[in-house]
């Protein structure tokens, strides 16, 4: 029955490319509508015999998608989930992006979804994300293929490997602050941290230092990201169409880089560990098989997306939150100056120094708790699942969300307050499956340590260069349109240089 459904949808996509005036289009569309109606009736009859979670599915194929997307863009997802939890409980059904979906709230629900990959559930992305990220990335691969892909990326993102890249990242951040921040009375934070985060990726992923080339790639990425949240309509004038074109252009550039790097590796003018591109090109699985070009292309698309969003959001929001919590900012300053006091003039930050930035990382964690860069992720049930007295049918989507734990006083005391100290002692007082800014389980973000390193080094160099700052508009709102949550106007600040 699922195969029939998929073939019907495929046929629909095919006939929608026909001239709408043709009689064949009308006949085909009527037939498809009839088949889909029969499928809905069949599924409805089967599901009526099951004890499904409470909730409402709404209009077929549409459900509550528009309400959900509106909440996403207005930064009111917490309210969306809270209203349904209050009405239906911690387990409820809805319909999102064309699929019946069960939302599991709280740490128990998070644990069920995140700890049962390929046992009860498997990763599920909306179709437009799959088209833009590709089917061969670490984010989309499943089972053994996913494990192999994570193994390939560990050669770059593992803590041992990251230590060798501190120097390059440190140099780029210091250069960026000297060029874009130092000597300025006022700056707008968001566009600057976006530029910095992307340029770091361009250098450490592809060894691209040329600013014009960095800008060109950055614009392509922005086009792809905006299209990720647009209606999946592949027609001129639509954001999704522009995103697909951007991905095609990105592929062309990447293929040229891959070809050149293969030649350089063979000649010895490039090393196997100089950047992520070299790491992926020289990786071999336990059978001695290298990654294909498509696998490398899709991973770069996925990683550029993930590393960009999950880092720019906390980097920008740290400024906003610390500006309204000056006592916390002073603790950050004290920690960073203490590290500097133990360094010789011109001596660079080391991995040991990063490990000593405990309070600074607590500030970043609290920022991620209050404004998680991801609201959660979807999975698909690969078997009927029994949970909390309900049946979640095979084929239905499941959604876990950070909004069911991050802002709740059941898990975090006075959650509305900015309290970095709640993460002291390595966060041992934080209950499992309640703090999930980078996901969890087998699919936790492979690059979270990379993101952590960027944030800590950036804060260090800012404190080293400036004694303080004040916001131009302390009450600037946070927007989630598009994801992730960000200052709606970029958050302008006045800078006061260190004497």
Swiss-Prot record:
Alphabetical UniProt keywords: Heme, Iron, Membrane, Metal-binding, Monooxygenase, Oxidoreductase, Signal-anchor, Taxol biosynthesis, Transmembrane, Transmembrane helix
GO molecular function ontology, one term from the record: taxadiene 5-alpha-hydroxylase activity
Membrane topology according to the record: Single-pass membrane protein
Essential cofactor(s): heme
Main location, first listed in the record: membrane
GO cellular component: membrane
Signal sequence segment: none
GO biological process, one term: sterol metabolic process
Family of the protein in this entry: Belongs to the cytochrome P450 family.
Protein name: Taxadiene 5-alpha hydroxylase
UniProt source species: Taxus cuspidata (Japanese yew)
């Amino acid at each position: 029955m699922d195969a029939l459904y998929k073939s019907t949808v495929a046929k629909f996509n095919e006939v929608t490319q026909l001239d709408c005036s043709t009689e064949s289009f009308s006949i085909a569309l009527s037939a498809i509508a009839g088949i889909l109606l029969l499928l809905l009736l069949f599924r409805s009859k089967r599901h009526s015999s099951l004890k499904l979670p409470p909730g409402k599915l709404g209009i077929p194929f549409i459900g509550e998608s528009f309400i959900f997307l509106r909440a996403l863009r207005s930064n009111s997802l917490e309210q969306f989930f809270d209203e349904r939890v209050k009405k239906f409980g911690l387990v409820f059904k809805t319909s999102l992006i064309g699929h019946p979906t069960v939302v599991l709230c709280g740490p128990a629900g998070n644990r069920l979804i995140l700890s049962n990959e390929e046992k009860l559930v498997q990763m599920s992305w909306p179709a437009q994300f799959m088209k833009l990220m590709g089917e061969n990335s670490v984010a989309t691969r499943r089972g053994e293929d996913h494990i192999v892909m994570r193994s390939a990326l560990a050669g770059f993102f593992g803590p041992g490997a990251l230590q060798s890249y501190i120097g390059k990242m440190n140099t780029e951040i210091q250069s960026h602050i000297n060029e874009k921040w130092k000597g300025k009375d006022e700056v707008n934070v968001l566009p600057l941290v976006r530029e910095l985060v992307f340029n770091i990726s361009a250098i450490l992923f592809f060894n691209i230092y040329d600013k014009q080339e960095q800008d060109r790639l950055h614009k392509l990425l922005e086009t792809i990201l905006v299209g990720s949240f647009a209606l999946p309509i592949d027609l001129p004038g639509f954001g999704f169409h522009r995103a697909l074109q951007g991905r095609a252009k990105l592929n062309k550039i990447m293929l040229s880089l891959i070809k050149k790097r293969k030649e350089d590796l063979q000649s010895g003018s490039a090393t196997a560990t100089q950047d992520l591109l070299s790491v992926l090109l020289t990786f071999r699985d336990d059978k001695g098989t290298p990654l294909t070009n498509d696998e490398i292309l899709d991973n770069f698309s996925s990683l550029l997306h993930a590393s960009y969003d999950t880092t720019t959001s906390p980097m920008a929001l740290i400024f906003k939150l610390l500006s309204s919590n000056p006592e916390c900012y002073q603790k950050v300053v004290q920690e960073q100056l203490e590290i500097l006091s133990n360094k010789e003039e011109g001596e660079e930050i080391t991995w040991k120094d990063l490990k000593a930035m405990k309070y600074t990382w607590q500030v970043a964690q609290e920022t991620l708790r209050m404004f998680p860069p991801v609201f959660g992720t979807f999975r698909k049930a690969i078997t009927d699942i029994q949970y909390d007295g309900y049946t979640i049918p095979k084929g239905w989507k499941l959604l876990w969300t950070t909004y069911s734990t991050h802002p709740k006083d059941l898990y975090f005391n006075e959650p509305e307050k900015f309290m970095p100290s709640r993460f002291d002692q390595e966060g041992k007082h934080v209950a499992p499956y309640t703090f999930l800014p980078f996901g969890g389980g087998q699919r936790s973000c492979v690059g979270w340590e990379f993101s952590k390193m960027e944030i800590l080094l950036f804060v260090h160099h800012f404190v080293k260069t400036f004694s303080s700052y004040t916001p131009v508009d302390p009450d600037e709102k946070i927007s989630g349109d598009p994801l992730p949550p960000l200052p709606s106007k970029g958050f302008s600040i006045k800078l006061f240089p260190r004497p």
